[in-house]
């Protein structure tokens, strides 16, 4: 079924594309976008903080963020409405200003003088509702701050291909990000038809440690997205993985169940896909920005919930730094941290101290040396990231102090001039 198209207020070519939906419920509601009753109180309190009632604003969810603009989805009279808004800092529940990210719920108002009978008015986001979760990933560069991925996510789905050989280190880093954000984590192994049954079983056993779910899908034939659809039903799930992992192919399959991904026409594809190189199985970047995609309602899929299923597709990640949250790393490597808790000294470095339970476990063969080495590297990288973040915060506060000091001196000189 072709993707549904709607009108929306924009004069920018980069936003003139199909709305990411293929199946239309009889009536759209905010629940279709992932809204549930617990959001109502937060929305009312946020509206009150803006000196208004909830009815004075439009409640919308951020579906995409571009360089200077963002796209919003809301519902009106049973229809799904796509709005355009300028990308500007918005006040959050802490009274601080920050940019909206994909998945945020925002209160907006129309900008006077925009819109007409054929398209909605352009909107201005005024406040961000308190986030339930906020997923970020550390930048691979030395100076950049953490990069936002999505907000209000229930589950992080790690999409990892079986060919070329899966990277357990990358999976562990994604898992730590999920734990740092307080969301569930699932592993979806794609291209399972490119390896033997024995290899596939081995991957499931070795890579599924600490996961809430492990699923396998075959990209080239017999593609059945039903297990994944059941996993994400009634949730907001973000797909993360490297280029060529099959994230966009999986999204298209979820939107067009029963359609062979190889035979799916371009007009039915919400997300573009690219082939991988035969030599090494590596892919190219196809998805270039984070995009929120609404699936058919959970009621239609048999989940028995009125809350809709929302997917967030993301560009492939080339390099992934460790999270700065050391407790999330401990949770990911729960076997290592359990041994570490039994060490004689609380500040044990697990190298040569007497009474080190970790070294004893390594000597006894109870702990995999390669896994411990990955844990050690992630912990060291996490410590460097925290130090870098502290240095960056110090520079920012120092610049703010210098700016305020200069402004104070200018004001003082101005007052002295008037006195003379």
Label each region the model flagged.
Residues 71-73, 101, 118-124, 144, ...:
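Switch/coupling subdomain of P-loop NTPase systems
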Residues 2-28, 53-56, 82, 94-105, ...:
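Helix-rich effector regions associated with P-loop NTPase G domains
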Residues 56-68:
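Structural detector for short beta-strands of small beta-barrel domains
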Residues 152-160, 180-192, 211-217:
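Conserved beta-strand/loop subsegment of P-loop NTPase cores
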Residues 243, 248, 253:
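Walker A/P-loop
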Residues 70-75, 108:
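SH3/SH3-like beta-barrel fold
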Residues 184, 193-245:
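Canonical P-loop GTPase G-domain recognition
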Residues 78-88:
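A short macromolecule-binding patch
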């Amino acid at each position: 079924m072709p993707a549904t198209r709607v009108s929306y207020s924009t004069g920018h070519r980069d936003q003139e594309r199909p709305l990411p939906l293929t199946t239309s419920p009889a009536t759209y509601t905010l629940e279709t976008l992932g809204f549930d009753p617990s959001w109502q109180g937060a929305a009312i309190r946020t509206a009150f903080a803006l000196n208004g009632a909830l009815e004075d604003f439009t409640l919308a969810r951020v579906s995409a963020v571009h360089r200077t603009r963002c796209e919003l989805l809301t519902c009106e009279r049973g229809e799904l409405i796509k709005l355009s808004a300028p990308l500007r800092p918005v006040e959050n529940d802490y009274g601080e200003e920050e940019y909206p990210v994909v998945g945020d719920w925002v209160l907006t108002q129309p900008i006077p003088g925009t819109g007409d009978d054929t398209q909605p008015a352009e909107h201005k986001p005024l406040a961000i509702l308190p986030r339930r979760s906020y997923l970020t990933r550390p930048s691979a560069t030395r100076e950049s701050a953490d990069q936002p991925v999505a907000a209000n996510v229930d589950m992080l789905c790690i999409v990892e291909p079986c060919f070329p050989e899966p990277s357990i280190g990358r999976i562990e880093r994604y898992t730590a990000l999920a734990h740092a954000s307080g969301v569930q984590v699932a592993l979806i192994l794609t291209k399972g038809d490119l390896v033997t049954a024995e290899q596939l079983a081995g991957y499931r056993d070795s890579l599924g440690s600490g996961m809430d779910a492990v699923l396998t899908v075959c990209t080239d034939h017999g593609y059945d997205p039903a297990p994944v659809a059941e996993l994400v039903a009634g949730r907001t799930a973000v797909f993360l993985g490297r280029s060529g992992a099959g994230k966009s192919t999986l999204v298209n399959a979820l939107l067009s169940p029963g359609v062979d991904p190889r035979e799916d026409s371009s007009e039915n594809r919400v997300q573009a896909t690219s082939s991988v190189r035969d030599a090494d199985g590596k892919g190219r970047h196809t998805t270039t920005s984070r995009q929120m995609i609404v699936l058919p309602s959970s009621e239609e899929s048999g989940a028995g919930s009125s809350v809709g299923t929302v997917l967030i597709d993301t560009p492939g990640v080339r390099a992934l730094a460790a999270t700065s949250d050391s407790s999330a790393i401990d949770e990911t490597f729960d076997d290592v941290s359990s041994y570490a808790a039994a060490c004689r000294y609380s500040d044990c470095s697990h190298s040569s101290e007497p009474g080190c339970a970790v070294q004893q476990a390594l000597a006894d063969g109870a702990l995999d040396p390669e896994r411990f080495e990955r844990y050690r590297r992630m912990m060291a990288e996490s410590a460097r990231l925290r130090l870098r973040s502290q240095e960056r915060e110090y520079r920012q506060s120092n610049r703010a102090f210098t700016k305020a000091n200069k402004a104070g001196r200018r004001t003082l000189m101005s007052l002295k001039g008037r006195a003379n």
